[in-house]
Amino acid sequence: HHPGICNAPFSNLYFAASGKVGPCWIQLGDMGERWSPDRSIRDIWTGPTFTKLREALAEQRFPGPCGRCRHDIESGVAPLAAIYDREPEIIEWPTSLELELSNLCNFECVMCTGDLSSKIRRNREHLPPLDVPYDDSFVDQVAELIPTLAQVRFSGGEPLLHPIMHKIC
């Protein structure tokens, strides 16, 4: 069950509103993986970036942003990696998805940013809307994963406002 210090790249895919993909939100920026209609979920999951990350973590190395979890462990604080310890048995496909597919939101919570709230992006940050890459081909690819999924977590803006979430559900 525990191939390394963190199960996230063995069990989870996190999709951000920007199209970035990683095993968790900490690894989104550094990995450089991005979903597009030309780059499938399967391509990302089986590709060299995830493969190298799995190898490093299996050898107890913390590449790039994974150092944040190492710091937490060394400080005696529960790291983000600990939430992926609860994942079911590791198989060859993801058992968990975290979907932050849009920043569409009808709130402007004081603690939030425009990355997760379209209203904040427009009214406080005065930025144009995010260009969200997810389409019907993404929905079809997620549907192919349903047999292996134990859980799907929805976040980003107000998830129930996202039209694509209704297609996925």
Spans of model-derived segments:
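Conserved alpha-helical substructure of the radical SAM core
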Residues: 31, 73-169
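Accessory C-terminal segments flanking Radical SAM cores
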Residues: 1-84
